[in-house]
Amino acid sequence: MTQTNQAPLVIKLGGAALSCTQTLSQLFGAIAAYQKSAQRQIAIVHGGGYLVDELMTKLQLETVKKNGLRVTPYEQIPVIAGALAGTANKLLQGQAIADGLNAVGLSLADGGLCHVEELDPELGAVGKASPGDSTLLQAVLNAGALPIISSIGLTEKGQMMNVNADQAAVAVAGALDAELVLLSDVSGVLDGKGHLIKTLSEQEADALIQGQVITDGMIVKVKAALEAANDLGRPIEVATWRYPEKLTQLFAGESIGTQFLPQ
């Protein structure tokens, strides 16, 4: 493998991909094939809300959300951390290993990768992550492994915290000085004629929201992506995992979705 001078790439994996073995296999297979010829360092950050929802239903625990964020009572965090840092992380790691990758399962707390503190007392054990020390993560990458990082973190006092996976990915990318792609069910932002918009600024997005081109759940995704770009201080990309043949282009630094520009 040849080392490139490209910045590392953090891929936040979300949406239905997490529950679809075939999709995961296509993604990990594409990473394995890409890394045989080029060594751009890649790390995965994941959530796993669907697993948590299933577990909460089985345990007859109520799921409450505030402004789209899951309320995590402190007494429930062991269960939620088990689902995310345990089951979801090992399912992804297992699939990556099956597809020929040397995968390492990590959390935001490992090696002090991210600092995490309580976001809002009303949300309970929900944390906000900020970039920390990437030394351990860099060592894993330098060893040729694929880090798969759950969005569970620890505070300075050792309290487990559930961090929104998009926000966790921003913090990891910040720690690594990496580029960030939010990979999901959505291919990017479409204009009024159904064509993909290649780049989007906050002003352009506001105009499209006013004109009702961007509507409903997409408004939340767009605002989150713009916030991520501002937090990171560099463009971030929203793209889909639905076209595996395009993933190699993405790993190489080409845009296949919509790039969100920081202010």
UniProtKB/Swiss-Prot annotation:
Reactions catalysed, as given in the entry: N-acetyl-L-glutamate + ATP = N-acetyl-L-glutamyl 5-phosphate + ADP
Annotated organism of origin: Vibrio campbellii (strain ATCC BAA-1116)
Top-rank taxon: Bacteria
Keyword match Nucleotide-binding: yes
EC numbers for this chain: 2.7.2.8
Location(s) in or outside the cell: Cytoplasm
Binding site for substrate: G48, G49, R70, N162
Name of the protein described by the UniProt record: Acetylglutamate kinase
The family this protein is said to belong to: Belongs to the acetylglutamate kinase family. ArgB subfamily.
Lineage of source species: Bacteria, Pseudomonadati, Pseudomonadota, Gammaproteobacteria, Vibrionales
UniProt site positions, description: Transition state stabilizer: K12, K221
GO CC terms of this entry: cytoplasm
Chain's role: Catalyzes the ATP-dependent phosphorylation of N-acetyl-L-glutamate.
InterPro entries attached to this UniProt entry: AceGlu_kinase-like_sf, AcgluKinase_fam, ArgB, Asp/Glu/Uridylate_kinase, NAGK-NC
Pathway(s) per entry: Amino-acid biosynthesis; L-arginine biosynthesis; N(2)-acetyl-L-ornithine from L-glutamate: step 2/4
